[in-house]
Amino acid sequence: MYYRVQTGAFRRRENADQMLYQLTDQGFPGFLLYENNLYKVQVGAFQQINNAIQMEQKLRDAGYSTIIVTK
């Protein structure tokens, strides 16, 4: 199981691409995942929840709303 930090979920790919661009421009290792008819913008694939929590805090400090998800 992996922990990922999600910063957004969009029906329109353009909106997801815009958030992904902002993340990567700020140095975050973001990626796009299409799942359940949504484009999800996520960061990381952490084996330890503590690492995901640390990344989540960095993203929140940068102004993103976040949620930790598992895969």
Where are the language model's segments positioned?
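Extracytoplasmic
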Residues: 1-3, 9-71
